[in-house]
Amino acid sequence: MQEDLELGNQNFPMVLVQIPMYNEREVFKLSIGAACRLIWPLDRLIVQVLDDSTDPTIMEMVSTECGKWATKGINIKCERRDNRNGYKAGALKQGMRHSYVKTCTYIAIFDADFQPEPDYLERTVPFLIHNPELALVQARWKFVNAKKCLMTRMQEMSLNYHFTAEQESGSTRHAFFGFNGTAGVWRLAAMEEAGGWKDRTTVEDMDLAVRVGLHGWKFVFVNDVSVKSELPSQFKAFRFQQHRWSCGPANLFRKMTMEIIRNKRVTIWKKLYVIYSFFFVRKIIVHFFTFFFYCFILPTSVFFPEVNIPTWSTVYFPFMITLFNAIATPRSFYLVIFWVLFENVMAMHRTKGTFIGLLEGGRVNEWVVTEKLGDALETKLLPQVRKPRNGFLERINSKEMMVGIYILCCASYNLVFGKTVLYIYLYMQALAFIIAGIGFIGT
C-alpha cells in the first residue's frame, strides 16, 4: 500500500470497521480507540460501533467515546437498535443495512475486547486487493492476559493449537476454514453473494464462512498478523464460552449438511472436507471420543479385567496432540500434561453442548456474553472487582466434582486390585477434575 500513497487517497478502497458490543464497560474504550488509530486515509475509513448495551450509563459512555473520536476527524458511527434479536448476528445484520455500508468494499470486524495494531489494515487488505478470488483474510489472536492464571495459560495453548493445526492447515490445503468471528477482513461482495449474516445459530461467523466457501470463494489465514485480545479468566465464563463454541457448530452441522451435499459450486473433495473433517471430526466426534473414552470407558475398564484396551490407543492421540501443542506454544511445554488433562475436563462441557446442538435442546441458542476485565488486568484493580459473599461455595462446580470422585475411585480400585499402572493416569485426571470442581483453576 505504501507504493500507492503517491496516487492519492482515492486509490485506497473504502473500509468499514465494525465493533459489536453489549454492556462492555471494561473494554469499549480499548477497542474503539484501537479501531480509530488504524492507519488508513480518514476519508476511506468508517468505524461503526454496534452498541446493543442495555445499561444507560454504559450507553452514554460509549456515545461520549464515539463523540471524542469524531472531533478528531474520524468518521465514526454509533448505531443502536431497540431489541437484541439475534444477538451479535442480529446487530451485524442491522449494521449492514445502513446506506453508507454500500460505499465500502471491505469490512473488518473486531469484538469489543480486540485491539488491532495500527498497521492491521495495511497488512491485510492488500491480500484482498491483489487476489480477487479471496473473500476473507483472518489474523491470529494474541492474548494480553495469557499469564494471568493457570486457566488462561491452558486457553492460550488450546487456541495456539487451533490456529496452527486447524486455521493455518485449512488455509494452506483447502483455502477454507471457519471464520473466528473477529480479527478478520471480509470482501463485502462475497458476504452479499452468500446471503449475509444469519442468526439461526450462535456461531454466525462459522455459518457465514461455510456459505461463502460453498460459493467458491477462498480464505487465507495470515499467521504473522496478530490482534490483541482478552481470555476469560473466570471458569464460569469460560464454560459458557465453550458451551457456545461446541453447541453452535453442532447445530449448524445439523442445519447445513444437506445444503453442503447439494451444492454444485465446489468440488466433491471440498464438500467431503467440510462435512467430514471440518464438522464431523473436529466439531463432534473429537468431543465425544475425548470425554467418553478418557473419562468414562478407560476408568470403568479397571472393574473388568477381561477388557484389554491396547496401550497404543490410550497414548497415541494425547502424544500427537501434545507434540503439536509443544510446537504451537513452546514456552508452555512444561504444562502440556496438565493441558491434556484439562482438555479432558472441558470435553465434558463440550460434549454436553454438542448433544444440545445436534438435538436442538433448550439451551441451543443460549448466548452469554463472556465477562471481561479490560484495564483491570494491567492496572491491578482486580481486588475491586465484585466477588460473591460466599466465594468458596460459589466456586464449587458439582459436575466436575462428581466425575473427579468417580475417576478417583476407579484409580484407587486399580491401585489395589489391578495389574496395570493405569491408576497413575487416573489419579492425575481425577485431580484435574477436582481442581476444576473446587474452582481453583481461574481467578
UniProtKB/Swiss-Prot annotation:
It is found in: Golgi apparatus membrane. The active site is at 52, 205. GO terms for molecular function: glucomannan 4-beta-mannosyltransferase activity. The keyword DNA-binding does not apply. Signal peptide: none annotated. It catalyses: GDP-mannose + (glucomannan)n = GDP + (glucomannan)n+1. It is a multi-pass membrane protein. GO terms for cellular component: Golgi membrane. It comes from the Eukaryota. Keywords: Cell wall biogenesis/degradation, Glycosyltransferase, Golgi apparatus, Membrane, Transferase, Transmembrane, Transmembrane helix. It is an enzyme of class 2 (transferase). Its EC number is 2.4.1.32. It holds the Pfam family Glyco_trans_2_3. Substrate binds at residues 111, 113. The chain crosses the membrane at residues 284-304, 321-341, 400-420, 421-441. SUPFAM superfamilies: Nucleotide-diphospho-sugar transferases. Its main location: Golgi. InterPro entries: Glyco_trans_2-like, Nucleotide-diphossugar_trans. GO terms for biological process: cell wall organization. Probable mannan synthase which consists of a 4-beta-mannosyltransferase activity on mannan using GDP-mannose. The beta-1,4-mannan product is the backbone for galactomannan synthesis by galactomannan galactosyltransferase. Galactomannan is a noncellulosic polysaccharides of plant cell wall. Belongs to the glycosyltransferase 2 family. Plant cellulose synthase-like A subfamily. This is Probable glucomannan 4-beta-mannosyltransferase 11. It comes from Arabidopsis thaliana (Mouse-ear cress). The lineage of its organism: Eukaryota, Viridiplantae, Streptophyta, Embryophyta, Tracheophyta.
